[in-house]
């Protein structure tokens, strides 16, 4: 469950703002504990986070990743994108809560519902949720080249599309339809 922090740190390092990956993860968790679990213990997000701990760690939700990103000085804006499959998937109860947090006054970031991310990629970095529980980092190098970083094993791979780069990383990865675009 450290993957959200480690994937975000990979992007921050590439942007020249990186730090220790565990520090980034801890910023995500600090936000989630204070802004989600303590303030709204009965929310879908709190119930999900506490019910899906892995080795004592909480998953990184998009709002937590956005909050941590905002703590670092960059000139980038963040757009969280999701497709209709994700909206109706196993995390559907979290979507409306996450949208409120991400677009609210504290974070003030954008949300975009779209089903055609592959053909419209204009972002340089994308954190991609795979298998509904694991974050990987993707860098859009140029028109026909994407590089993925998997924090689980510290491996990377490339491909001519984002999907191909992820497939080259690990064939078992299924893109869930949730993207944090930077």
Regions found by a protein language model. Name each.
Residues 181-182:
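Short, solvent-exposed mixed-charge patches
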Residues 34-135, 139-176:
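Conserved active-site-adjacent core of cysteine acyl-enzyme catalytic domains
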Residues 1-41:
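Active-site nucleophile-adjacent alpha helix/oxyanion-hole segment immediately C-terminal to the catalytic cysteine
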